[in-house]
């Protein structure tokens, strides 16, 4: 079985690298053959040079840390609020009937529309950015947790109840562990949205992270720099996504064993 998994593992690593290489080649050919202005679309080498220059500045790493910290703090806050509410919705049908019709509508609200309201309520700075990140991750985690809890095999819960499990014991030792893959799936998507929320929040509500850098570069028509910041944000979101995905895979494996 391990031998059969090796080609699949190699393909998992190679496929995105090959895809990225094709994307970069197409990008370079577009800038070379069309003669498009550099301020509209810089070539990949110009972006790479700009990226190396930015990464040599200590300020860039501080800005990355600020945005990453806001995203992680917001995701943690959203998770702490979403999990108890999700369990309450799962347990009490009346609460589910009251809340669930509004979940779809609230998920449709764009972050850029929520940010000005947070400024009025909380003011400028890091706090409203973290709150915005929390709102971005709250609904995916809430919905995925409710779905995961509702799809637990009822026979397992009945067997646990026969052994005396009830209340907090049932939740801690049966329901939440069995729903962990779904919870982590929501958390995985939530982290990516949290990075988006941090950037949007910084652009609208101020701050000292990558969102402010992106705003300054837009004002200076520094397109190569904007591409670099976008690439850094993508890498940050990907790293967080992969970390939670690995945890999710390990949980799934543990449950199947």
Describe the role of every protein-language-model region.
Residues 3-4, 33-76:
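Periplasmic/extracellular loop-to-transmembrane helix junction in inner-membrane transport proteins
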Residues 131-135, 168-201:
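Transmembrane alpha-helices
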Residues 149-155, 159-179, 219:
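Short helix-to-coil transition segments within interhelical loops
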Residues 1-19, 242-257:
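Transmembrane alpha-helical segments of polytopic membrane transport and secretion proteins
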């Amino acid at each position: 079985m391990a031998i059969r998994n090796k080609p699949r593992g190699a393909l998992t690593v190679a496929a995105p690298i090959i895809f990225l290489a094709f994307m970069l080649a197409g990008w370079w050919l577009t800038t070379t053959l069309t003669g498009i202005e550099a301020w509209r679309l810089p070539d990949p080498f110009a972006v790479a040079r700009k990226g190396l220059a930015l990464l040599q500045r200590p300020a860039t790493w501080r800005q990355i840390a600020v945005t990453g910290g806001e995203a992680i703090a917001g995701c943690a806050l959203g998770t702490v609020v979403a999990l108890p509410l999700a369990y309450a919705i799962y347990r009490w049908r009346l609460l589910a009937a009251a809340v669930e019709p509004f979940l779809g509508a609230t998920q449709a609200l764009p972050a850029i529309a929520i940010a000005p309201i947070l400024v009025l309520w909380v003011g400028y700075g890091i706090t409203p950015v973290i709150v915005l990140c929390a709102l971005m991750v709250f609904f995916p985690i809430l919905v995925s947790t409710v779905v995961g809890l509702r799809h637990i095999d009822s026979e397992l819960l009945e067997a646990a109840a026969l052994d005396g499990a009830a209340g907090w014991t049932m939740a801690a030792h049966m329901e939440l562990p069995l729903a962990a893959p779904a919870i982590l799936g929501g958390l995985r998507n939530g982290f990516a949205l949290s990075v988006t929320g941090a950037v949007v929040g910084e652009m609208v509500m101020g701050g000292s992270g990558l969102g402010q850098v992106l705003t300054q570069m837009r004002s200076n028509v520094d397109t190569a720099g904007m591409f670099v910041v976008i690439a850094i944000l993508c890498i940050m979101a990907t790293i967080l996504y992969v970390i939670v995905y690995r945890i999710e895979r390990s949980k799934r494996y543990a449950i199947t064993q």
